[in-house]
């Protein structure tokens, strides 16, 4: 069972600055659309994971380090969408529902440079992973969740490949 980032078991863990440097992923050989940063250990693991992919396939990091303000905007926007879809929903319930897809700011790994949004690319562009990047559960009929069954066989295979190389490099694929 997935533990959501809004869960008390997560939110009560203290966040401590370790001093680990942030590095430009491009300088580590990672494909990015523009300058993206992550903690050095994350960048190193991504570089290793990239080497595990078959010839012609690469990791492509869409977003790494995210300013707190951007994370808050994403969270606020998604919560507003959920409130429109579920009139009368309690603040607590919208918080939990939103955390299936967007990390609450107080524990969001992106704001620490500890998470990346990524996909796989080949010679002709992005590989099929079943949904566009950032498709919400509502927009994708739940297909954005890693174990979704309403995606193509090709997308399932590509998701499994992505999870395998990330895991082999010591990274965790958050399944929501």
What are these model-predicted stretches?
Residues 1-64, 68-175:
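Extracytoplasmic cell-surface/polysaccharide-interacting catalytic and binding patches
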């Amino acid at each position: 069972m997935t533990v959501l980032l809004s869960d008390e078991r997560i939110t009560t863990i203290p966040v401590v600055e370790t001093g680990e440097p942030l590095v430009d992923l491009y300088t580590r050989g990672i494909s990015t659309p523009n300058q993206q940063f992550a903690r050095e250990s994350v960048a190193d693991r991504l570089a290793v994971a990239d080497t595990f992919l078959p010839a012609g396939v690469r990791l492509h990091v869409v977003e790494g380090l995210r300013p707190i303000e951007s994370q808050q905007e994403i969270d606020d926007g998604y919560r507003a969408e959920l409130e429109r879809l579920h009139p009368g929903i309690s603040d607590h319930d919208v918080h939990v529902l939103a955390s299936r897809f967007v990390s609450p700011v107080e524990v969001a790994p992106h704001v620490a440079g500890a998470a990346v949004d990524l996909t796989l690319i080949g010679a002709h562009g992005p590989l099929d992973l079943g949904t566009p990047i950032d498709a919400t559960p509502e927009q994708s009929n739940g297909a954005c969740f890693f174990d979704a069954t309403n995606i193509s066989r090709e997308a399932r295979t590509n998701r499994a490949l992505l999870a395998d190389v990330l895991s082999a490099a010591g990274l965790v694929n958050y399944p929501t």
